[in-house]
């Protein structure tokens, strides 16, 4: 894929601000410019950014209903009521359940957890789950990463004498469920200043408030921060402010003393012995936690995350690793089928969105396929499969387009839907799928801009090879953890040449291993361009080209840097 490069040279005002900030922080203008672009303009803000402090976490009692939630939990414990921690079957839900269950279990034994079966119960609160709670004597359900739209289900639970505390981060409807307390920073009446917590983050704030109210030292929560880091990375929420603090300290824990369950996954992934990043969570750890819920039942992942014995955890980790291998095979097959449909249908090539459906696609994998199609075609995408006389779908969007609002515009055709700006899920009658497709595509056509369907690469700065040093790479690491709203800085260098040894590599000859020289300074650097072998012929033609890249540590030669090439284009100068 060739990107449109979005790069604006710094204004004189920005240059001056970067120079002043760089002088105060003893930092190069390049790094200071990156801070200015992130709207970090003062010395104190920069120190908070580079050294996030747990003491700067927001008071959890600023969240609407937090005092009510803590009081109800205290009452349940005082009365020795049975408590059920209930959560979604994805990474965010599983880590949230593990965090809340592990923390409360230290102080209270009459507690259990429950993850609904994706295939038998579907998303969110299920009647089967409530019946299980009723049969086992549960009086309070703490529900995490779902529940904000479960009006009928929670009314049913209420009729059985079961109370709910909802900890969710998805967009609520105008009418909310009759829960005892609803913790959700996206509530329009919620004054909590940070709106981008994930489900596990909301669960953490609840436990933080409970600890504060009961004079439990905050240090008892710190061993659970690795769950927060995993959920923040996997749920792709903005890594700023509160999330940056939680991710920073959670990642630190993941690298030094992870929980037994996460350690077993790290070992199964072959990641032990190296410094873990948010990317390792997104591409290695997260998919394995997700795999059990995609292929069978997510409870296995929570069993693993709360396990205290390493040998038992390792056995479970091997089990979910097998699920992940199966998921990858199905994912590859479904993506090829979906891609084939788009390629064959001429009309689809001109639409601003993609809606695909097939009776045989696996429900647990359609979200991944939607993500892949969005990356390939850069259009809002919905992939649906059949479940009896119902259709279940997953939606993914492109930067700047609110797919939740697009789905909401068709709500009269839907039985259920939920999510947020860039990802959502929906359920409708199978015989309504075509009408939904037409309405959804019409809405997208009316509301999306051409720029939003154009692959865009945001360049942070132009740089000469001579300025790319090991010291710079080490300084760039201080900007981590990376993620939405704090992406890894992308640089560009114009007029570079092949130094003569660049070659195509990889099992399927899909990558290029590069040795490049900068025309300005004659500095030579190594790089890798994943999936860009189509550019090899041009590179070997001895003509100049421009590259966009991130600056990485060479994992084989620790004292050297390596460029990870994001895009290659002919130089037009």
Located regions from the model:
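Short alpha-helices
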Residues: 99, 175-216, 221-233
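Short gly/pro/ser/thr-enriched loop/turn and capping motifs at secondary-structure boundaries
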Residues: 119-121, 150, 170-175, 189-191, ...
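A short acidic, amphipathic alpha-helical/loop segment
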Residues: 152-156, 369
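Generic beta-sheet signal
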Residues: 114, 144, 167-169, 183-185, ...
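Hydrophobic helix-and-loop "lid/oligomerization" segment in the mid-to-C-terminal part
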Residues: 2, 10-140, 160-161, 211-435, ...
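Acidic-glycine-rich active-site phosphate/pyrophosphate-binding loop
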Residues: 75, 171-184, 516-521
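Mid-to-C-terminal polyanion-binding domains and interfaces
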Residues: 75-81, 312-316, 322-356, 409-573
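Intrinsically disordered, low-complexity regulatory tails of plant transcription factors
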Residues: 150-151, 235
